[in-house]
């Protein structure tokens, strides 16, 4: 589906038409430049590769420099492919946040905040005896048994244990578009999206 690359600026809130305070996320969406056009005849599928944010030539590998020169654009820091664009695009074309003027809902793909190695309480919601907050023992926050002994003599896959939390690719669907500020390439989306401030996200129609 068509979309854009963007950068998460942060969260704020706006007032709706009926006076309610609505939390929203501000995204700097684009402008993105077409760096490659893939066709069914040549590549086996139709898609458009977009580049976002300039970077210095000295920080770009030679193969990528050749890729950008063929497109006639400056080196880009982030690249992503999108399919099913309604209009025919050519190398070097610029796509702005105005493509979301007619969009009511979008999907956002981002990388969730990395939390490092976490236990079962934070990672899986273990802990406690019911909703007790006082009087419970620390052992109530432990994972408990992870399997039998001589049979099956192993830990089954999917057993909920401590481990790395966050840092995953996350897609949030059907987020409402509250406002498009084309002059500043800003997109206001209702609610939160994955990632920290300054992280790169993909917005799809």
Curated annotation (Swiss-Prot):
**What is any one of the record's Gene Ontology cellular component terms?**
cytosolic large ribosomal subunit
Which keywords describe this protein according to UniProt? Ribonucleoprotein, Ribosomal protein, RNA-binding, rRNA-binding
* One Pfam family it belongs to: Ribosomal_L3
Q: Which GO terms describe its molecular function?
A: rRNA binding; structural constituent of ribosome
Q: Which family does it belong to?
A: Belongs to the universal ribosomal protein uL3 family.
The record's PANTHER family line, in alphabetical order, gives: 50S RIBOSOMAL PROTEIN L3, LARGE RIBOSOMAL SUBUNIT PROTEIN UL3C
The protein in question is named Large ribosomal subunit protein uL3
Q: Which gene encodes it?
A: rplC
